[in-house]
């Protein structure tokens, strides 16, 4: 069995409320084992014999659509992959942003195309800066995300694909499992 983390987009925001015990039950219905949730923002840890993330993502998305009645984009990583993300220093070239008060990690299903990366990077404004590494992007802000003029919707428009974000503290907690 392999341990995975499902990062669900837009759970418990915008009126899409799902209690964590219900979410765990939905994952158990799919045959996943040792299902746990971490904070009420769509982070689900589970074990499965499946070896590839893409079919797991599709299975979860189909089941959640069937049971909840709306699309839930799902991004699957292993705890080891998340630990590798946490070990990166994407802003090492910037003294200010290397020590920024807010660092978020965004997840997409496949590495963005070069033009998408360029569009994302162009959102940077000195206060908010971006870096892309594989299937993740990093958003460093000298303020809090709530004070930023950049939105998740603007990021998705730049990337032209759905994504979900977590703060680095949450990613560290998910990687420690």
Which stretches of residues belong to each language-model region?
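Surface-exposed, charge/polar-rich loops and edge strands
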Residues: 2-41, 45-177
């Amino acid at each position: 069995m392999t341990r995975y983390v499902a990062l669900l987009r837009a759970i418990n925001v915008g009126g899409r409320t799902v209690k964590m015990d219900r979410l765990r039950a939905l994952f158990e219905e799919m045959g996943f084992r040792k299902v746990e949730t971490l904070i009420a923002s769509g982070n689900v840890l589970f074990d499965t014999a499946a070896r590839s993330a893409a079919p797991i993502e599709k299975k979860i998305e189909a089941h959640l659509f069937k049971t909840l009645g709306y699309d839930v984009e799902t991004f699957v990583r292993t705890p080891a992959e998340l630990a590798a993300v946490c070990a990166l220093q994407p802003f090492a070239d910037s003294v200010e942003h290397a020590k920024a008060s807010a660092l978020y990690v965004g997840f997409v299903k496949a590495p963005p195309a070069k033009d998408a990366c360029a569009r994302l990077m162009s959102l940077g404004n000195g206060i908010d800066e971006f870096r892309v590494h594989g299937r993740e992007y990093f958003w460093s802000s000298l303020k809090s995300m709530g004070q930023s003029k950049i939105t998740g919707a603007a990021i998705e428009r730049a990337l032209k694909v759905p994504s979900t974000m977590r703060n680095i503290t949450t990613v560290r907690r998910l990687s420690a499992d």
